[in-house]
Amino acid sequence: MRLLAAAFAPQVLAAEPGQNYPTKSVRLIVGYPPGGAGDIFGRLVANYLSQQMGQQFIVENRPGAAGTIAAAQVARMPADGYTLYLASAGDFTTARSSFGARLPYNPERDFTHITLLVKVPLVLVAHPSVPATTLQEFIAYAKTKPKQLNYASFGNGSTSHLAAEAFNLASGVEVTHVAYKGSSPAVADLLAGRVQIMFDTVLSGSRFIKSGQLKSYGVSTLKRVPLVSESPTLDESGLPGFDIATWLGIVAPAGLPAPITQALSLKLDDFTKDPDILKQLDALGLLVDGSGPAAFSTFIFEESARMDKLIKDAAIQFD
């Protein structure tokens, strides 16, 4: 009997690899530089998990190539729960279209998808000199000036670029792309009137809307955003189904044991419902999602296909 019990003991222990997880500090890899919005959000998540799970969750910044360098490194790490990654649209759902065969990982196959935490809405803003107050007025105005108006983006292949091309397709206008190296120079030229419109992050655009330096035509998600609650959605304003946003979620290397996945998913679900956290997310112009592992995996598959179609339909070139 003792031999029988001893023979079964290892199997019982092996069946519960996440029973006491975590037993040491956990790294949360962030593919953004320190101080940016992605880094701020990552630290908010890490601090919450540290408080809730009894071990330190430490943010490690590894910026470069829209996060794909960091994502590739994480994909090759042990699936033991001690390395997590803050995934986003740029390194997951638009990465294959933008990087093609150069992408060194498969966003669907090479990761365990734990929780889709938030959507990052954009707001369509215009310089005050544009003679249009509403979205429909702007569309009518732009149709009288095909290829004569310009829109700024954060860079070629960025979500602000994709949103504007989706807008061109949905509205039938032809506004010309001017790519910048990041948000700051793009916003600076918009404020100076060198370009007419852009899809900016809600956090950035809200202060210029409230100061009257820019005007809003609407937000890019199907839900209104509390930080700019006076701005309608583009869907409400006459572009049915318009829904373009980046997103942020937590993933790990493929093969993460189910108990660890479940433990993290439960705590991250609590994160998206915590009243203090929700106030901070509202202040950052974010929309809570909270989809768990199965729904997150489905989202990545479907959103990748949707973005691939948009990129093809708009003939967007990344090189």
Positions of predicted regions on the chain:
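Stable alpha-helical elements in mature extracytoplasmic
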Residues: 37, 41, 45, 49, ...
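An extracytoplasmic/periplasmic, membrane-proximal ligand-sensing/linker region
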Residues: 23-25, 170-173, 210, 236, ...
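N-terminal export signals
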Residues: 1-15
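N-terminal (or domain-start) structured segment
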Residues: 14-109, 147-148, 156, 172-197, ...
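Hinge/capping helix and adjacent helix->loop/strand transition within the periplasmic-binding protein
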Residues: 76-82, 97-185, 234, 245-280
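Structured segments of extracytoplasmic/periplasmic soluble domains
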Residues: 32, 48, 52, 77, ...
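A ligand-binding cleft/hinge motif common to bilobed small-molecule-binding domains
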Residues: 91-100, 161, 166-170, 197-231
